[in-house]
Amino acid sequence: IGKRLSGRDRLDEQRAALDEIAAICDAEKVDLVLVAGDVFDTFLPSAEAEDAFYSAAKKIAGTDRCMLIISGNHDDNIRLTAATALSEELGIYVYGNAGHIPKLCGGRRVYPVEAGANHIVFRTGEEEVFFNVLPYPNETRLKEDKNPDEKFLDKMVRWMNVGQAENKKNLPSVFLSHLFI
């Protein structure tokens, strides 16, 4: 959101596309919307782009749907997760910071029943699904890792395995990430 084309502002078109996504979610009775990064076009999106995103996310989540969002390479992971105290109350769960554990909020058709730094489990009725999440591994996260000499691909596989190891109930599993391989 916020991308310009040849210097031309496209925010109105982006808002219209997001409104269409919200309408499709309502018409199709979508339970959960996944966003695998690159919410914004830049680390420092305009206030208008941020407003478009937060307004659209609230509309898409509605009153009984959840959203699961992870940061991409164009997103500032800290900035993207800055509003989690508010967004989680609206059923919008954002992973960007390594170590952030979402607050479990119910009251929706689909709701989280378990969450950790790299996973979240959603339930609807009697069914549960496990999400192993790996936001874009930015340079800061790579530097914080304890194995600086490990190859990038090996590191990604290890991080995926750490997340998957949290699936103690052997639930159906979805891996959600934003990677370059």
How should these model regions be labeled?
Residues 36-38, 70-73:
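Glycine-rich beta-strand-to-loop/alpha-helix junction loops that act as flexible
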Residues 30, 62-67, 92, 171:
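A short helix->loop->beta-strand "cap" motif at the edges of active sites that frequently abuts
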Residues 45, 75-181:
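His/Asp/Glu-rich metal-coordinating catalytic cores
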Residues 34, 68, 174:
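Hydrophobic "anchor" residues on beta-strands that sit immediately upstream
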Residues 6, 21, 53-55, 68, ...:
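Short, flexible coil/linker segments at or flanking structured domains
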Residues 1-64:
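N-terminal active-site segment of His-dependent metallophosphoesterases
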